[in-house]
Amino acid sequence: MPELPEVETIARGVDERVRGDRIVQVWFGSHREPFKTPPARQARELEGRAILAVHRTGKHIVCELGSASGGPLEERSGRMEAQWIVHLGMTGRLLVTAPDALLAPHTHARLSLSSGRELRFVDPRRFGRLEFRDLGRGAGFSAPGAEPLTIGPEAFAALFRGRRLAIKAALLNQRLLAGVGNIYADESLFRAGIRPRRMAGRLTGPVLERLRLALREVLEDAIRLGGSSVSDYVDADGMRGFFQLEHCVYRRSGLPCLRCQTPIRRILLAGRGTHYCPQCQL
């Protein structure tokens, strides 16, 4: 599943390419699984709207939309009136393509834009979700957990205070931290020198601060390298990321630790494969 760096990379790429465009026409596939809002309503609501901006919230991509009418001035300075929310699920892709680009199998949505390009949602396993929100009728989307890139020391420590669960499981809890998944939990715990089984509520303030900084550093490094392409992930242009080449523990079971040469171990924790160095992580 794409995690925070992958979703951030896609959102930035889409924003750079479609900001200021207007949605001219919408086509949705026949499968109903991706649609949190009924597809007929989504198509009707999306057509004609200006795309004001695209950003990430947690593991979701949020397209900020203006009204369904108005000229070029509104397209650039209009007020957000609606949102189109994309969750990539396990295998989802959000691509900006030429209109005549080969249609990938499992394409569930095509938005034709005023620039002549298309915004396409492709999802082979169909765990992704597409949702439309009219801000005149309800609240905009917000992730339930804290933002790992900006959370401060005190707020970060408070997330884990009294938690009787392993720190790896706590990092994966989207109600605590939005966007952290298996890859970046393993990698940040390695950088911080913390064993994934340690109880979150027993970690001291200095140890948690070390983890906060390591997590932010790992996420920023991954964004800089375009994310981790360990499976289907590609960015908005269909290009793979490179952070998988920097992984220190994730999917390196049995291989020597890059710091101390001790073999990396793999255990099952919180239902997820978990990788760590028994020498470097205490």
Where are these regions (language model features)?
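Short, contiguous clusters of charged residues that form electrostatic/catalytic patches at enzyme active sites
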Residues: 9, 154, 158, 213
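Phosphate/anion-contacting hairpin/loop surfaces
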Residues: 80-191, 199
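Intrinsically disordered, low-complexity segments enriched in small/polar residues
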Residues: 68-69, 76, 136-138, 224-225, ...
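Basic, nucleic-acid-binding surfaces and adjacent catalytic neighborhoods in DNA/RNA-processing proteins
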Residues: 23-45, 55, 60-62, 159-282
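Gly/Gly-Pro- and Ser/Thr-rich, intrinsically disordered tail segments characteristic of DNA damage-repair
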Residues: 1-127, 150, 205, 252
